C-alpha cells in the first residue's frame, strides 16, 4: 500500500513538473516577444539556476577531480549552453507547441545512436514507430494551412538543432560523475554553462532598461505584467521548482516512468499556449502532435525497457543531470 502511494505521489510530482516546464516555454516566449533577445533569456535562466544550485556544488566540492572536467565541460557546452540558446531561439520563430514537438523527438536519435554505436537493438516495431513519429512531426509542422510557406524554415532548423543538442545532453549525462550526487551533477555543469553565458551576455551588456516594460498575454485572459516578472518565473518556477519536483518524483517512480510521464509536456504546452498566448493549432497539427507524442512514448518505453545505460530525462529545457530534464 505504501509503495503504491509513493508511486502515485511521484507520478503527481513529475506531472506537476511537466506543467511548470511547459509553462516556462510560454513565459520565455512572452519575454522574447517583449523585447529581450533569446540569448539574453537563456543567459538569465542559466545564470539564475547556477546561483540557486551553487550551495549544493560547494557541499561536494572536495569530491571533484581533474578527470571529471572534460565530460562535464562537454555536457555544459552542448547540453546546457547550446541547447538553451537554441531552444529559446526556436521559440522566437515558432509557436510553443511546434518548438516542443520538435525537441521531443530526441529519443529517436538516441535510440539510433545506441543501435549504431553500441549495437543495442530495440524491437522491430520500435523502428517502424520512429517513422510514424517523423510523419507526425511533418503533419504538425506543415499542417498549419499554408504548407511550407506558412512555417519558419529557420525556426524548424533551430528546433531540430535543439533536438540534437538535447539528445547529446542525454548521452553525455551518462558520463557525469555519480559521486557528486544529483544536485552536484546538475549544479557543476550549470555553473560552467553560466560562465560561458557571461562571456556571450556580459552583465554590463544586459538590457536592464527593458525590465520595467509591460508585456501582455494575448490569449483568453489578457493580462499585463512587468517584463522582469517573466524572468523571475523562468528561473524559479520554470527551472528550480520543477527540477526539484523531478528529483523527488524520480526517486519514487524511477527515471523510465518519469520519462514516459514527461511526454505530457508537449500536450500541456500546446493547450497552455492556446489559452495564454492565443496560439491556435489546426486539426491537422493537433493530430500530428498527438501522433508524435504517442509514437515517441512507445519508442521511449521500448528503449527504457530494453536499454538501461542511458535514461532520457522527463522534461525540457534541460536542467537536471540526465535523470532531467
Regions of interest found by a model, annotated:
Residues 40-51, 87-130, 162, 255-274:
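Specific alpha-helical transmembrane segments that line the substrate/conduction pathway
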